[in-house]
From Swiss-Prot:
Keywords: Cytoplasm, DNA-binding, Transcription, Transcription regulation. SUPFAM superfamilies: YebC-like (SSF75625). The keyword Phosphoprotein does not apply. It is found in: Cytoplasm. GO terms for cellular component: cytosol. This is Probable transcriptional regulatory protein GK2594. HAMAP family: Transcrip_reg_TACO1. Pfam families: TACO1_YebC_N, Transcrip_reg. The lineage of its organism: Bacteria, Bacillati, Bacillota, Bacilli, Bacillales. Belongs to the TACO1 family.
């Protein structure tokens, strides 16, 4: 994985989402609701809930919003049944796109996702058409300004805790784990005094596609359109966004 900062692409996406904070909080509340409903409202015994709560806190979601979503899921009132659906397709220039949705209306969601692709130079594909281009990984990002630590020392700590590898950029250390090792590595590094700019299980592209001109504009519009949809939780893609820094 060396030579390309996956966190840069993810961070750029998160910054765009932060600009739409109200919508982001709504989506996080839905994710908390689903996790609490399926695994219980105690984060100590529900790893999925614990992880999404940490993600919500990292996004500065108010604690009362988090508690409200948990209480809604574990209370006696009528529950909303959300279903997770994944769509796969191609953006302009053959960029691979995976869209993760939580929806209570599959027909509405399918129509909206299909329209987003069609209007922005892409097309939906069959299940599995691009998923093989991504790998599910735990990603822990440590801000270098916040931690005065030797790179080799941190790498040794991470590997001993169960991490697979670490990448270093000017701004951060990016530690990658297998999904099943994520909590163990995270807990061990926290015990060593580290905090994280981001901690999540995500989909990492194995290769990247570079676009320019109209194709790049259409691809960015496709991402924005999908992320604006209330049913869409995550948009993963293999667009090389480093060109946006130039």
């Amino acid at each position: 994985m060396a030579g390309h900062s996956k966190w840069k692409n993810i961070q750029r996406r998160k910054n765009a989402q932060d600009a739409k904070r109200g919508k982001l909080f709504m989506k996080l509340a839905k994710e908390i609701y689903v996790a609490a409903k399926s695994g219980g409202g105690d984060p100590a015994s529900n790893p999925s809930l614990r992880l999404v709560i940490e993600k919500a806190k990292a996004a500065n979601m108010p604690s009362e919003n988090i508690e409200r979503a948990i209480k809604k899921a574990t209370g006696t009132q009528e529950h909303t049944n959300y279903e997770e659906i994944r769509y796969e397709g191609y953006g302009p220039g053959g960029v691979a796109v995976m869209v993760v949705c939580l929806t209570d209306n599959k027909n509405r969601t399918a129509a909206n996702v299909r329209a987003a692709f069609a209007k922005n130079g892409g097309n939906l594909g069959e299940t599995g058409c691009v998923s093989y281009l991504f790998e599910r990984k735990g990603l822990l990002v440590i801000d270098r300004e916040q931690h005065n630590v030797d790179e080799d020392e941190l790498l040794l700590l991470a590997i001993e805790a169960g991490a697979e590898e670490m990448e270093t950029t000017d701004e951060s250390f990016e530690i990658y784990t297998a999904p099943e090792s994520f909590e163990t590595v995270k807990d061990e590094l926290e015990q060593q005094g580290f905090t994280f700019a981001s901690a999540e299980i995500t989909m990492i592209p194995q290769t990247y596609t570079t676009l320019e001109g109209d194709d790049l504009k259409k691809m960015l519009k496709l991402i924005d359109t999908l992320e604006d949809d209330d049913d869409v939780q995550e948009v993963y893609h293999n667009l090389d966004e480093s060109v946006l820094e130039e």
